[in-house]
């Protein structure tokens, strides 16, 4: 996978993950082109399209479009399944995810994506393991944010 974009029906970019090095200018150009292309397509049209030298795979869930660019030899159906698995993980974590969850908790959405995909390849296939890792990270964050006394810090209590 070269990149993943999440954008709204209004064309607002909500999440972007790039797995290939590109300049900011090129990223903006790609994003603008793809958002326009995908939003212009009718709902009954195929979720795969050829674009430049890549294949674009996208799926709409509620008000969000999940859009991935893959290389010519990659499997479109597996990519659709990757998108679906990511949505399932977001649903499990947020409890029926919506666009606002991603807007206000974008760092969690990125963290979930990073636990699931590494370098554009699936890192962990088990939803349970991904969610367990996220739970552990949440616990660590809560621990770090909990105020402790000086005596606790140096281990005297």
From Swiss-Prot:
It is a peripheral membrane protein. One of its GO terms (biological process) is intracellular protein transport. Gene3D superfamilies: 3.30.450.60. The keyword Cell membrane does not apply. Widely expressed. GO terms for molecular function: clathrin adaptor activity. It is found in: Golgi apparatus; Cytoplasmic vesicle membrane; Membrane, Clathrin-coated pit. The keyword Acetylation does not apply. GO terms for cellular component: AP-1 adaptor complex; AP-type membrane coat adaptor complex; clathrin-coated pit; cytoplasmic vesicle membrane; cytosol; early endosome; Golgi apparatus; Golgi membrane. InterPro entries: AP1_sigma, AP_complex_ssu, AP_mu_sigma_su, Clathrin_sm-chain_CS, Longin-like_dom_sf. Keywords: Coated pit, Cytoplasmic vesicle, Golgi apparatus, Intellectual disability, Membrane, Protein transport, Transport. Subunit of clathrin-associated adaptor protein complex 1 that plays a role in protein sorting in the late-Golgi/trans-Golgi network (TGN) and/or endosomes. The AP complexes mediate both the recruitment of clathrin to membranes and the recognition of sorting signals within the cytosolic tails of transmembrane cargo molecules. Adaptor protein complex 1 (AP-1) is a heterotetramer composed of two large adaptins (gamma-type subunit AP1G1 and beta-type subunit AP1B1), a medium adaptin (mu-type subunit AP1M1 or AP1M2) and a small adaptin (sigma-type subunit AP1S1 or AP1S2 or AP1S3). Binds to MUC1. Belongs to the adaptor complexes small subunit family. It is linked to Pettigrew syndrome: An X-linked syndrome characterized by intellectual disability and additional highly variable features, including choreoathetosis, hydrocephalus, Dandy-Walker malformation, seizures, and iron or calcium deposition in the brain. Intellectual disability is characterized by significantly below average general intellectual functioning associated with impairments in adaptive behavior and manifested during the developmental period. This is AP-1 complex subunit sigma-2.
